[in-house]
Amino acid sequence: MKKTVICILSLLLTANISAQVIDYTKPDSLKVMSLFKKAKTLKDKSMSSYMVFFGRQFKGVPYVAKTLEKNANEKLIVNLHQLDCTTYVETVLALSKAMAQHKPTFASYCENLKHIRYRNGKVAYPARQHYFTYWIQENTKEGIVKNIQSPTPPFSATQTVKANYMTTHLESYPMLKGKQQWIKQIADMEKSITGTRQKYIPTKAVTNSNVVRKTVHNGDIIAIVTTKAGLEISHI
């Protein structure tokens, strides 16, 4: 049986808005503005309220993997009509941050998305935070999220990360073909998180108990970790 982990990320706010070139369609930009218009009617203006609200707006959106792999040269892709688990979380978080910053504009959404998805906001394939443990660490440094691994219980087990899936499965990543420098940078990313020890809630402890209800809150991001070789987190 696979081992699972729940990592709770409470959300903090930062502001750093600048203009940029992005890859998007008109329906995507219109949807962003439509969602902002709806969110303005909320009485609860907290970050957690925005996270729950925007999260619910994407019910029924098709699950499509690898929507970020469409360009030979990396671009900031905005796609609200096809989502996987990671792009879903990034989309909801970027929308929520823009509202919490009182900047409900398409430009603000894109700026937030850029800093959530890429290390230091630099749009480049090797800077994309491919491993979610790395995503957590970098977004924690940026003050965008807070990584919570307590109290004990329910965080009663420990996982030691060993990441090498991308560099040992290059055939699954066409963008890396023939790009030795990029491969080295991905290997550096893997090395930086390998050995990380993180507390998690074991499957048997995921129950409708008082301690779990007091630990997991509305708007939290939950990461599920697997024992699959080379990977650390399988779903969010």
Where are the predicted features?
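Function-determining sites in protein domains
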Residues: L42
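Sequence/structural signature of beta-propeller domains
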Residues: M47-K59, Y63, L68
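Acidic/His-rich structured neighborhood in mature extracellular/periplasmic domains
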Residues: Y63-K199, H217, I222-I224, I236
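Short, surface-exposed secondary-structure edge patches
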Residues: V211-T215, L231
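C-terminal structured interaction module
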Residues: A229-I236
